[in-house]
C-alpha cells in the first residue's frame, strides 16, 4: 500500500484529469487514505485493550468483501462530504490494486528493499520523492498526507462509515471512534517527520523494543528512494512477468482512479446501471490486485462477527 501522500496526490491528479472540482478537499483526502486511517487508532495499545480494534478491521477491509463495501459507500452516500470521501476511497482502492503487487515484489528478498521493514521504507521513500517533486521539500507534513475533515463534514463521513461497516462487516463501531481515527492518523504522522534526523535516531532505537525494525522508521520522512528499482518484475500473486516500474505504475494507478470515479459519478447521475458499475469496480484484494474468494464474498456477517466490537 503506498503511503498517504502518494495516495492523496494520485487521487487529486485523477480528479483534475476528469475535470472534477473538489469542494471538500479534506474529505477527499481522508477517503484517499482508505482503510489505512484505521491503523493508527489507539496504536499504543494492544488489540484487545483498544476501545475498538480498528487496525484489525482495517486489515480485513483490504482483503474481505472489498467490492461489497465500495458498493455500500456508493449506495449510502448523500452529502457533498460523503460524495468526495467515497470518491477518494475509490481512488485508494484503485491505487492499491495497481501498486501493491510491485511493493511486495520490490521488498522481497534479493530486491532493493528486501531488508526487514523494507515495505515501509520503500513506501515512505516514494512519498518523499513525490513530495519533493511537487513542493521542493522531501519532508512530508501531515497536512499534505492526511488532513482531517472538520465539523459537519467529519460527522457525515463517520456516519457513512458506521452504516457501511455495520452492513458489510457486522461491526457496530461508534461514530466517535471512526471520527477519532482521522485525528490519530494526523497526529501520528505529524510525529513522523525528521528533517534533521533527531527523531529518526530516537525511533531507530525505540522500534527495537516496540514493533521491530521498520515499524516506526518505515514511516519517517524525508527518505531517499533507491535508484536501482526494477522495471521488469514478477507479480507475486499471479506469477506474471510484468514490465514497468514504480513511476509507470503510478500513471496506471491514476488512470484507474479516473475510471472508478467516472463510473461512480455516472451511477449517481443515473447514467450507469448497477451491473456495469459492479463489473467496472470489481472486488479485488487491495493486497494482490486480484479477485479472491475472500474479496468477492457477498455473504452477510455471521452472528459472531456481528457482535464483535473490539
Predicted regions and their residues:
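N-terminal leader/auxiliary helical segments
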Residues: 1-86, 93-310
